[in-house]
């Protein structure tokens, strides 16, 4: 099973709590995290894009780096790990995104790919006059399909004459083209989102579910398998989990409870309000806005000792259609080190990393 890191491009990572580590996103922080992850054999690193935060006393996600430029910098200081930037497709034309990706492909020597997002948080786009209207909630995957087709055309042939409802290319060109096969990620969970991923993506990003229920996402992975049957492609799932690990189950649980006790209710309420605006939202967005465990945006959470977390991650790997997991931590620097030293060596699904290190 592949292991990735969802790097903290926004302040405070993925914890909406005053009891969690409070920090600003910087290039140096993310460089340290990704270089450490690369040293422990992580397969990929992905950065999101966020253009406006949730407010509250923690100013959650009010401070964010930009995804493509961050990953370009990280491409220059890494050598093996695959890197994915996220493009907010309402903000950057596909031909420009294709050229940016080709540039980072050159910097990284073929280790770059793109995560495509349509945009669900209206204030991110309204603030710069780019929100197309609420009807976009219903047509966004049609828009994204055209966007992805233009990308594929330009990367495959260097030119595009695509004509659609949203984009019109006229002998549009990109050169040099990427040397590697450019991979696309999408996070579609609605019926339209799954259909898009099965047609255009290489991996589909989904949320884990619940606390210490590592296989609860299995129905989502199964829906993707069924969508693949209609397209004849083999798009696999990549599942997001937060790791809260310690020497004992009790110590890890105490830390998790302390984080929840400091929940920034104002920021969480803002998330719930904006998340409910998209009536056509898939399960990911509805899950994010659910107040049940919104302190970490309701991503799947694995809490326990090193051995407990290793066992649960191996359970994740057993779900059909699962390519890998993408991890977040309460403390990213320590979390990556603890994973590499104390959790990964106990994982059956990562035995190949230990064997590789023995050979080296």
UniProtKB/Swiss-Prot annotation:
Keyword Hydrolase among UniProt keywords: no
Gene Ontology MF term list: alkanesulfonate monooxygenase activity; uracil oxygenase activity
Enzymatic class: oxidoreductase
Domain of life: Bacteria
InterPro entries documented for this protein: Luciferase-like_dom, Luciferase-like_sf, Pyrimidine_monooxygenase_RutA, SsuD_RutA_monooxygenase
Documented EC number(s): 1.14.99.46
Binding site for FMN: 49-50, 115, 124, 140-141, 190
Cystine pairings recorded for this chain: none
SUPFAM superfamilies: Bacterial luciferase-like
Swiss-Prot/TrEMBL keywords: Flavoprotein, FMN, Monooxygenase, NADP, Oxidoreductase
GO biological process, one term: alkanesulfonate catabolic process
UniProt cross-references to Pfam families, sorted A to Z: Bac_luciferase (PF00296)
Keyword Nucleotide-binding: no
Catalytic activity as recorded in UniProt: uracil + FMNH2 + NADH + O2 = (Z)-3-ureidoacrylate + FMN + NAD(+) + H2O + H(+); thymine + FMNH2 + NADH + O2 = (Z)-2-methylureidoacrylate + FMN + NAD(+) + H2O + H(+)
Family that this chain belongs to: Belongs to the NtaA/SnaA/DszA monooxygenase family. RutA subfamily.
Biological function: The FMN-N(5)-oxide reacts spontaneously with NADH to produce FMN. Requires the flavin reductase RutF to regenerate FMN in vivo.
Protein name per the record: Pyrimidine monooxygenase RutA
Species per Swiss-Prot/TrEMBL record: Pseudomonas savastanoi pv. phaseolicola (strain 1448A / Race 6)
């Amino acid at each position: 099973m592949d292991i990735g890191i969802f790097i903290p491009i926004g302040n405070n990572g993925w914890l909406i709590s005053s009891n969690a580590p409070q920090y600003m996103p910087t290039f140096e922080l993310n460089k340290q995290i990704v270089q450490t992850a690369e040293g422990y054999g992580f397969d990929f690193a992905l950065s999101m894009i966020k253009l406006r935060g949730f407010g509250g006393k923690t100013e959650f996600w009010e401070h964010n780096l930009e995804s493509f430029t961050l990953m370009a910098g990280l491409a220059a200081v890494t050598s093996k790990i695959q890197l994915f930037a996220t493009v907010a497709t309402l903000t950057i034309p596909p031909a420009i995104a294709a050229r940016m990706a080709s540039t980072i492909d050159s910097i990284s020597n073929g280790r770059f790919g793109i995560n495509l997002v349509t945009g669900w948080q209206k204030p991110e786009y309204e603030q710069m006059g780019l929100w197309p209207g609420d009807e976009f909630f219903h047509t966004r995957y049609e828009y994204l399909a055209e966007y992805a087709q233009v990308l594929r055309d330009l990367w495959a042939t260097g030119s595009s004459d695509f004509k659609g409802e949203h984009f019109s290319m006229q002998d549009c060109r990109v050169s040099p083209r990427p040397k590697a096969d450019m991979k696309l990620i999408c996070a579609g969970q609605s019926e339209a989102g799954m259909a898009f991923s099965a047609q255009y993506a290489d991996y589909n990003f989904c949320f884990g579910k619940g606390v210490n229920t590592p296989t609860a996402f299995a129905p989502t992975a199964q829906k993707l398998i069924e969508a693949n049957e209609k397209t004849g492609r083999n798009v696999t799932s990549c599942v997001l989990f937060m790791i809260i690990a310690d020497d004992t189950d009790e110590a890890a649980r105490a830390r998790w409870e302390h984080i929840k006790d400091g929940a920034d209710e104002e920021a969480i309420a803002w998330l719930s309000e904006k998340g409910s605006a998209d009536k056509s939202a898939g399960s990911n967005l509805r899950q994010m806005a659910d107040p049940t465990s919104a302190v970490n945006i309701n991503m799947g959470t694995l809490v326990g000792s090193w051995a407990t977390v290793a066992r649960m991650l191996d359970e994740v790997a057993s779900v059909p259609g699962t390519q890998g997991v993408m991890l977040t931590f309460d403390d990213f620097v320590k979390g990556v080190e603890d994973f590499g030293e104390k959790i990964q060596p106990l994982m059956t699904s990562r035995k190949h990393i230990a064997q590789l290190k023995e050979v080296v």
